[in-house]
Amino acid sequence: MNREGRGATTPHSIALSGPETFTGNRALDLEEGLIFEIGRIEVTGVDIAEPAPFRDRLGTQARTAPLDLPGLSEPEAMRHYVRLSRMNYGIDSGLFPLGSCTMKHNPRLNEKMARLPGFADIHPLQPQSTVKGALGLMAELSRYLLELTGMQAVALTPKAGAHGELCGMMAIKAAHAARGDGDARHVVLVPESAHGTNPATAALIGYQVRAIPARADGTVDPEAVKAALGPEVAALMLTNPNTCGLFERDVVAIAEAVHAAGAYFYSDGANFNAILGKVRIADLGVDAMHINLHKTFSTPHGGGGPGAGPVVLSDALAPFAPVPALVATADGLVLVEDEGADGAEQALGRMSAFHGQMGMFVRALAWMLSHGADGMRQASEDAVLSANYIRACLMDLMSAPFAERPAMHEALFDDTWLAGTGLTTLDVAKALIDEGYHPMTVYFPLVVHGAMLIEPTESESKASLDLFIAALRDLAMAAKAGDKERFLGAPYYAPRRRLDETRAARAPVLRWVKPAQVADAAE
Amino acid sequence: MTSVRYTKDHEYVRVEGDVAVVGISDYAQQQLGDVVFVELPEIGKVVTKGGEAAVVESVKAASEVYAPLSGEVVEVNSELEGAPGLVNEAPEGKGWFMKLKLSNPAELDELLNEHAYKDFLDTLA
């Protein structure tokens, strides 16, 4: 049932040089079933002694049908997961141009540091006196985050970007409540160019979302913000640089208008990696911003590891930071666990059970320390340079909206260049898989028709960028030359052919079901 | 006489007696691509013109459907729950979203007629 996507036929124009194999394997490209398809209950990787005779008390609850657990021997289990991993594509296998989520190289030094026993083998419930080094690392990370942003306080506990947004917005809600205008202010302004999580976050904590349309140049107009502000507005959430890869140049005027109306300014910091070391967030008038350690500071994510979304806060919001909070006392660093306690009198509560993602803190600080101030600044510059290089090299064949301005860390294209070819953005993305690349983000941001959003990050060399650009140029020329089959049938060479996204969404198969008929027929 | 009116957000309204049938236009379904899920309001919900009334989700995006007119939801197309593809097949037919009992029929005059909507679509091309 999971093999449906695998095409048995090859198109005429792109014939493979050999015959279809008898096994379904293609040399090193090995076919692999689901674990429930290959496992058998009677097989095990460990030798467990039979239990001594006992009398169970299950009565009528005793199971009568077999358990159907998939047993595998150790070599079978090893091969299963290694074979699956070979169908995967990650930043360690090639350029990963996903514009909606920074995928940069995670230096192995980070991993070495995170595996130091003093960081890796500690437990959140250990007495604080036995983890002074870990608390010291958290304090040092906080100092770096505050230095880089110019902000007053940081909450380390949020577990990822959207969780950080939630924390920042809850701080804003707590601040309004403390000020006495919490009930009156029930609206949050969110520009159309914001991340989708922004309106979702505002709605989750009971705010009504009011959209601000983008200007023709893709940025937010301060006049549009002023017109939407009022005594009912609690905050504005702005993504900067925005999802079109543009820096919001009027951000200071926007922040001033927001503050003049008695509201707070939340900045979505998911794209902080484009301005790290170049812009002090506090200078922009920001009251709260989350920082994706897993994007800006290279810690692994996207199936490769947990995220971490610390939130930096302005003076006005600092008192409402959640617990546990790190506080420096005469006796050294202390994690204040209870809201209302000394150092957390007005804390908004708790965002997570413990102090946050320790492993990510270690990796992020390792990245900061190994890069230094000059290295971090250069990382931003290289990320922006790489994106602009890609855009400049593809402009003659593809179409880029807002091209009159330099991009930030993302190169954005629309589908105007595909007009008349009979092909869509999706077809281009699928053809890119055949060329050995993970596709870019497609159909986002929504404000751009058939968007293709490419983020190379600072990880790629010029040689690597040139190969990627050459692949896209060849595809663009093939599309314009009418070589439709290359696109419409793509991917031809992936472990699975093009999947039926519509059927997958309309009638999702969320659970493996034993093919009863097949089993019966075999008996 | 039945006449169809449109909003610039690509909802349509077809007045039948004292109720108005609401859905999304053919252009909207084309832009969305294959619709995979529709979230309809509860019967009895009071909507105001321009306010959120439903959500339509396609393989490309999730979008809000705004109430083209103010009124009370008197019926919803529950067939869409099991067959969201009706929105693609017949947006102005079997793919309708909800029926509204209008609270301010005068609002109808503020919407685009078929000609004006077509002209509006031409400006988007």
Curated annotation (Swiss-Prot), chain B:
Disulfide bonds: none
Location of N6-lipoyllysine modifications: 60
CDD domains: GCS_H
Entry cofactors: (R)-lipoate
Domain of life: Bacteria
Any Gene Ontology CC annotation: cytoplasm
Residue ranges of domain Lipoyl-binding in the record: 19-101
InterPro entries assigned: 2-oxoA_DH_lipoyl-BS, Biotin_lipoyl, GCV_H, GCV_H/Fam206, GCV_H_sub, Single_hybrid_motif
Pfam family, one: GCV_H
Cofactor binding description: Binds 1 lipoyl cofactor covalently.
Keyword tags: Lipoyl
GO BP term, example: glycine decarboxylation via glycine cleavage system
Record carries keyword 4Fe-4S: no
Main function: The glycine cleavage system catalyzes the degradation of glycine. The H protein shuttles the methylamine group of glycine from the P protein to the T protein.
Oligomer and partners: The glycine cleavage system is composed of four proteins: P, T, L and H.
Family annotation (HAMAP family): GcvH
Similarity-based family: Belongs to the GcvH family.
Stated name of the protein: Glycine cleavage system H protein
Organism: Xanthobacter autotrophicus (strain ATCC BAA-1158 / Py2)
